[in-house]
């Protein structure tokens, strides 16, 4: 991300750009809430979206309609993807990471995260991230809240950050694996 000249931006331009980014995050919220089959997301709005800094993963803006509890943790999810991509060395336009590991930028296993790098003119511009509460992700009991569980793996399917899509092509192995546990 090119940051040269950023201190020269005038307050009006800054306000317009900030408002546009907020609108993008709000539209991400509205799109998921309208399209969701899951009533926890569609009705209770147990989800959130935002735009995150391309280098640091820090929160730039977050949608107004999602749950505010995710504001504090979503940047950790994005940072986990940045670290994973740096380790693997293969971040590309159209990649989408999915995961629910609560120890890596999360809240609990029912909150599934999607993180996508967004490129502008061939350069990484920011990350788009979404989190939403899923009814069931393969735990021993419906809803994943098992008071008899003695470790996290008895609560639900733990998915580390993996590519759901690679350069815009769906990774059907991840979809098939996930369907096998829920």
Predicted feature locations:
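Mobile "lid/hinge" segments at catalytic clefts and subdomain interfaces of large enzymes
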Residues: 121-182
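A charged amphipathic helix-loop-strand protein-protein interaction module that recurs
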Residues: 25, 68-101
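Flexible loop/turn segments at secondary-structure boundaries
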Residues: 59-60, 68-70, 104-108, 134-138, ...
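Alpha-helix capping and helix-loop boundary segments enriched in small/acidic/polar residues
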Residues: 12, 65-72, 85, 105-110, ...
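Sensory/regulatory domains in signal-transduction proteins
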Residues: 95-136, 150
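Long, charge-dense accessory insertions within large macromolecular proteins
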Residues: 3-78, 180
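Solvent-exposed alpha-helices and their adjacent loops that cap or buttress functional pockets
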Residues: 41-44, 88-91, 107-109, 121, ...
